[in-house]
Amino acid sequence: MAPDPSRRLCLLLLLLLSCRLVPASADGNSLSPLNPLVWLWPPKTSDSLEGPVSKPQNSSPVQSTENPTTHVVPQDGLTEQQTTPASSELPPEEEEEEDQKAGQGGSPATPAVPIPLVAPAASPDMKEENVAGVGAKILNVAQGIRSFVQLWDEDSTIGHSAGTEVPDSSIPTVLPSPAELSSAPQGSKTTLWLSSAIPSSPDAQTTEAGTLAVPTQLPPFQSNLQAPLGRPSAPPDFPGRAFLSSSTDQGSSWGNQEPPRQPQHLEGKGFLPMTARSSQQHRHSDVHSDIHGHVPLLPLVTGPLVTASLSVHGLLSVPSSDPSGQLSQVAALPGFPGTWVSHVAPSSGTGLSNDSALAGNGSLTSTSRCLPLPPTLTLCSRLGIGHFWLPNHLHHTDSVEVEATVQAWGRFLHTNCHPFLAWFFCLLLAPSCGPGPPPPLPPCRQFCEALEDECWNYLAGDRLPVVCASLPSQEDGYCVFIGPAAENVAEEVGLLQLLGDPLPEKISQIDDPHVGPAYIFGPDSNSGQVAQYHFPKLFFRDFSLLFHVRPATEAAGVLFAITDAAQVVVSLGVKLSEVRDGQQNISLLYTEPGASQTQTGASFRLPAFVGQWTHFALSVDGGSVALYVDCEEFQRVPFARASQGLELERGAGLFVGQAGTADPDKFQGMISELKVRKTPRVSPVHCLDEEDDDEDRASGDFGSGFEESSKSHKEDTSLLPGLPQPPPVTSPPLAGGSTTEDPRTEETEEDAAVDSIGAETLPGTGSSGAWDEAIQNPGRGLIKGGMKGQKGEPGAQGPPGPAGPQGPAGPVVQSPNSQPVPGAQGPPGPQGPPGKDGTPGRDGEPGDPGEDGRPGDTGPQGFPGTPGDVGPKGEKGDPGIGPRGPPGPPGPPGPSFRQDKLTFIDMEGSGFSGDIESLRGPRGFPGPPGPPGVPGLPGEPGRFGINGSYAPGPAGLPGVPGKEGPPGFPGPPGPPGPPGKEGPPGVAGQKGSVGDVGIPGPKGSKGDLGPIGMPGKSGLAGSPGPVGPPGPPGPPGPPGPGFAAGFDDMEGSGIPLWTTARSSDGLQGPPGSPGLKGDPGVAGLPGAKGEVGADGAQGIPGPPGREGAAGSPGPKGEKGMPGEKGNPGKDGVGRPGLPGPPGPPGPVIYVSSEDKAIVSTPGPEGKPGYAGFPGPAGPKGDLGSKGEQGLPGPKGEKGEPGTIFSPDGRALGHPQKGAKGEPGFRGPPGPYGRPGHKGEIGFPGRPGRPGTNGLKGEKGEPGDASLGFSMRGLPGPPGPPGPPGPPGMPIYDSNAFVESGRPGLPGQQGVQGPSGPKGDKGEVGPPGPPGQFPIDLFHLEAEMKGDKGDRGDAGQKGERGEPGAPGGGFFSSSVPGPPGPPGYPGIPGPKGESIRGPPGPPGPQGPPGIGYEGRQGPPGPPGPPGPPSFPGPHRQTVSVPGPPGPPGPPGPPGAMGASAGQVRIWATYQTMLDKIREVPEGWLIFVAEREELYVRVRNGFRKVLLEARTALPRGTGNEVAALQPPLVQLHEGSPYTRREYSYSTARPWRADDILANPPRLPDRQPYPGVPHHHSSYVHLPPARPTLSLAHTHQDFQPVLHLVALNTPLSGGMRGIRGADFQCFQQARAVGLSGTFRAFLSSRLQDLYSIVRRADRGSVPIVNLKDEVLSPSWDSLFSGSQGQLQPGARIFSFDGRDVLRHPAWPQKSVWHGSDPSGRRLMESYCETWRTETTGATGQASSLLSGRLLEQKAASCHNSYIVLCIENSFMTSFSK
């Protein structure tokens, strides 16, 4: 049963009535039952949740609760479900009973419709209604009506499908509060959104019977019917997830409550169902008002409908306020400082893209399970992942598959080849279970590609478990990208980074021959990025901006700008002002945060440079801004700004060539370089092109057509380590210059002298730019502007300048080979500390004999003993202590107070000053002359003269002598000196008094032998014992331990003598016999010192004893008493030592190769220096390596005669002149010189080219053969001089650049040409008159075969013959054709002057000519005999005569034909290369294969520019003209089929047509259908029209060449740059100047994008022989898989056909692309870097005639690699 239309009409009227009643509601806090749509418009204020409501029958009072519930009444027999009760007064059971009663009672009102009493505030900060306008309200009403109708239809359908009649009752509906719905216009849409839970009551207001329930919108978080909708108070914070906000206000619906950390559980239901998680997902989005997704109004019905709705609309995009309509949010990654995570979502997308290979909505939504993370996935657990979804993005359905994948990739995961490798795999394998619904966020495609780029060498042929192309992109998918944070950006950002790749629309790249790659900006160019991708949030405090630009207009334009997020204010930028009066400003735009309009921080005015390439840079350093123009500081101005730096807003824009909407002025012109550097320093290395050592520049960067121009790089003074910077040199002020004081401080000036390039340059380098002629005045502006003029003549030598002030001490050269130079002698240093004790000296001389001892008692006479052994040496005595001695003589010069080595700045005159003055002592005495000093280093560059001359000035006066250096610090103790000489014997001391006798002590037991004690003092003599009876003489005893009679035995030595004790003097008894030796007695106490006895008589000197053995050192004795002061010794007199050996070589200073001329040649002779002390003798150094020959230095003034001093100071003779040195190496070629003056009149030129064929003359009477050829005619007079030819191109060779050479000597007789075929001997005929036919009739008749005919009668004059067809050059004789199209303009040359010269020597005999047989004309009247013709070398011959015609009457004499003997005609280009040496200089060569004309020149040949081809007209009746010219074979070999052009083949003149090493094309076998010639005779096949093999193009039209490399390559090409470089090399080798790049896709480029956009649609693709392969580049990618023209050939750079030559056995070509030219990342041999068998690359078979056939082949194969010319460039731009 269909729904009743009347009921539907009533429903619509009810809705309209409700809409009209809304504004009439006076109480915003009440809700009328007649106003069911009041929730469509939120009230202005809402602070209470309670309010009056009409109470229906059988309803309960509505209770306000904090936990609102959803009440759903089952329909059609469905299970009745409800949630937790909202009121404590009604338990669930009672509430259920109430509902049942309401449904079963007599009242027709069935299910209750809970309506919120009061709408809560939409936001705590919202004070007023966010009105979207009347249009939004109308759209809401219309949407509600549409949902009502849909609800009614579905209700009727459900009721009838159940088989029962549904009464008129309202469907249970949940109405959201007014504040929980927010709308925002988006185009023509209004989006409604539920942002919070829905308060309801089971006993809320219901509608009456017979009416429909109020329609409602299905919330995006619609839950299961039993799921309590708990609302988190804040978005959860999970690792790697960024919950984004798109709110435009500052309000937050989250409050300050703690977010939940785990997914919410249901009682017994596990995790939240899918719909409940959807609510969590969207609440986390922190949505307020600006929502970018349209959510349709859906009815709340039963499960199947909910499931179907959620499958389509359940996954809603996270909204964004980004202007592009896409979400782009940056969040920090926990635990990884300096990273950012980007979540990207489309404006209306719902997850992954449709073509994604990952698990889609179906696999990750309907069957998703949240499981605990397996313990084996520790890699992911470290990232904070505890639970993960299955199935994951790799379609794994259980943990076993996940663990197997981790185990398979375990080794790769531990390589750490990418800083976020673990994040990538965990996002794929174990997506974290969050409060949001599945599918979770997968990694972005860019994330995958970045990982592949970093880890490709670790994959080793394997691939990632996911194809990067299957992942969503940042632009079109909802994904995660983790990359480096903006705070980790490089210190320099270049132009390519700022523009992006690919280039934006309306910005094109060109290769400028002077500056290289440049980018063209027009009025429609548009480039913009987010600034935080390249710069940190807090921009650099000090920085520099470098530009290389060429403005095209005089209008103002912004070069670079960083704007705020609204693009209203330029925070940082550079702008060129409009040109006025030949001047323009360069302004630095710098706006502090908070300003309402753009501010100008600094501005500089300088001459306009429109149309000129100009280098300039802005350096922001502290409180100043400096402008550098062409690498020279132009001006510096103060700059006031805040101290905290420039803070960029979130979403700040970055623009090149414009400023977005912040400034309407766009830059128009070209930009070659733009750099933003973190350092404020600007040096020549920075502001000039510093990418000379690039990095892989192949033809893709500069292209093979890029002409590397020689740039004059300035010298970087930092290459000389440690050399002091010269002080700033300024030009003298001129009239008109500003006198404004430089605002820089002294410290700034000093820094600028070192860090900036200033206005000074090294000698000879000059400065480049448009302001070279202008006078530079740093800090005061540019005084004189204008273009750079020619270099002036050197100025006159100026007078010597005055002596400069004494400069400060410079730095020290830290060179390992430097040698200190002795300075002036300083004062003597303070006395050092006493040295260590020296080694013991030798024994002294024997002392004087001592006093006679007392006569002892006469003992018994013993036997003489044997000589005793030498005793041990005694210990050294303690040193004496006496008063301080007088000061010693001055010592040698001490070491320098600096530890590093000295240089020229430490020599005399270096000028120390400052604190060193306080250390200086009194002036010492002048020392002897010192040795010659080392050569000095080059001085500072002199200031420029007024006239700008760079010639060196005269040498300055010598500087004043420097101050003496300070005294040196005390040196370290020296090593022990050698033993001194023996001193004289000392004076004997006085004899001491006798001491008292000590009391003997008790006798102790015998102890062990103790160590030898110190010598004691002499004791008193003991009492003599009784004399015993003499015993018998004993035998001689053994040698005793006697002591040598030396120093120890003298008086006072302190060593006791072992003697027997004596008793008191008794009577002398008889001699007794010697007794036995007794034990040693106890040593007595030391006795008192005895008195000094009187001097005894001098005894007889005893014999010297033997030297005793060295004893072991004894213990140190006690300190003795101070000895008496000795007399001073005599001064030693020593002779001066011998001169020391030669000192080490002088300091070696590192210099660059450009400075060798300054250092390696002797400088000017200086004045003799002050004599110094002789330096210490140093060790002889090793022989150094031979230095390179330096360039001659500037000639200095002649110095005074010098004097050479010897090391000891003596003056030697004058220096002698040395032997003549060897000649130096040849210097490099100099720069190109300027054009020279007009030359003098040259010698006569060579004969000109033969003229065009003349008109066909009337046939003359046959000549008389009797005259024959017995005599040669006389040479005719010389012709008039020809017109002046164009000037020749300058020839550049490796030795020099020659502008114009002198005329050479006349050439010798050329080589005789090959003789023609021998013809039949004919009879001599009479000489005939010269006709107008442009061939040699004599030679023609000589070759004709026939009998002599009789002389005919004089016939009547015949009619004039029909005019011939337009001329065909060498193949026919006719009048000239119509003029062709205008040719390319030639190079203008100076007007030439010439004189008539003598005739040249006769050339060699040329080969036979070629031609066609003409039609026979009517006989003409006989003519009189003509004069003989010119000699043979000046005739044009025809090797194939026509049949003889009938004799006719004699005709009038014709004019002399043109000479054509100096032309060689060859069939192929290779033949010309083989035989070009046989052709004399000045001859022409015509190559039939190419239809090109060349001229033989000295050491080569040159191509001749021809006019446009004029096609032969059809339908003239001329059979010869209508036929294809026959193939001509004039040499041994196989010919090619000639191509017929119906249009011009003229190319513009180009210098690269001259090949230094022209290619040698291999001789080919003829193609099928072409006869093979075995001789040099001309072969004439039957004349018939032929067609060329392939379509050809017109040479004057733009074309793109497709050429193959000379060898096949495998997949390992060293990347796309390696393949590009081979295309570049081989193209240059054969003289092709275009930009050739490999016909390959790679990671960074699609094959389709290689060719310039402007040349893709209309420029044909041709091969090396200009045969058309494809109509255009676009046609290759039009779906035909790169279909080529039928019969197309592809040649290599060396001219071989790759389809027929065996060098390419496999006729396939690599391309790595799909049919549309997009890169196939899974099939390009790992970015063309591997040749393993397992890797594959996309290839195509050329046998099928296609270039983009889809065939995956192993990278181990060697296939053809093609090179495509990526842009058409005229010859003038190459």
Swiss-Prot record:
Non-collagenous domain 1 association domain: annotated segments: 1474-1519
GO molecular function terms attached to this record: metal ion binding
Spans annotated as Triple-helical region 7 (COL7): 1301-1333
Compositional bias (Polar residues): 55-87, 244-256
Chain residue ranges for the region called Nonhelical region 5 (NC5): 1149-1162
Region (Triple-helical region 1 (COL1)): 786-812
Residues covered by region (Nonhelical region 10 (NC10)): 1429-1441
InterPro entries: C-type_lectin-like/link_sf, Collagen, Collagen_superfamily, Collagen_XVIII_Fz, Collagenase_NC10/endostatin, ConA-like_dom_sf, CTDL_fold, DUF959_COL18_N
Bias-annotated ranges (Pro residues): 884-895, 925-935, 967-982, 1026-1041, 1138-1147, 1275-1289, 1376-1388, 1398-1407, 1418-1431, 1441-1453
Changes after translation: Prolines at the third position of the tripeptide repeating unit (G-X-Y) of the triple-helical regions are hydroxylated. Undergoes proteolytic processing by CTSL/cathepsin-L and elastase-like proteases to generate both non-collagenous domain 1 trimers and endostatin monomers. In tissue extracts (brain, skeletal muscle, heart, kidney, testis and liver) predominantly bands of approximately 38 kDa are detected; recombinant non-collagenous domain 1 shows similar mobility. In vitro, several proteolytic cleavage sites in the non-collagenous domain 1 hinge region generating different endostatin-like peptides are reported.
Annotated spans, Nonhelical region 6 (NC6): 1205-1217
Residues recorded as bearing Phosphothreonine in the entry: T730
Positions of the UniProt region annotated as Triple-helical region 9 (COL9): 1377-1428
One Pfam assignment: Collagen_trimer
Region Nonhelical region 7 (NC7), annotated ranges: 1291-1300
Stretches the record annotates as Nonhelical region 2 (NC2): 813-822
Region (Triple-helical region 4 (COL4)): 1066-1148
GO annotation, biological process: angiogenesis; blood vessel endothelial cell migration; cell adhesion; endothelial cell apoptotic process; endothelial cell morphogenesis; extracellular matrix organization; positive regulation of blood vessel endothelial cell migration; positive regulation of endothelial cell apoptotic process
Binding residues annotated for Zn(2+), in chain numbering: H1591, H1593, D1595, H1601, D1666
Motif (Cell attachment site): 1351-1353
Superkingdom of origin organism: Eukaryota
Stretches the record annotates as Nonhelical region 3 (NC3): 897-920
Consequence when changing D1595A: No effect on zinc binding. Abolishes zinc binding
Listed CDD domains: CRD_Collagen_XVIII, Endostatin-like, LamG
Matches recorded under PANTHER family: COLLAGEN ALPHA, COLLAGEN TRIPLE HELIX REPEAT
Protein name: Collagen alpha-1(XVIII) chain
Organism per entry: Mus musculus
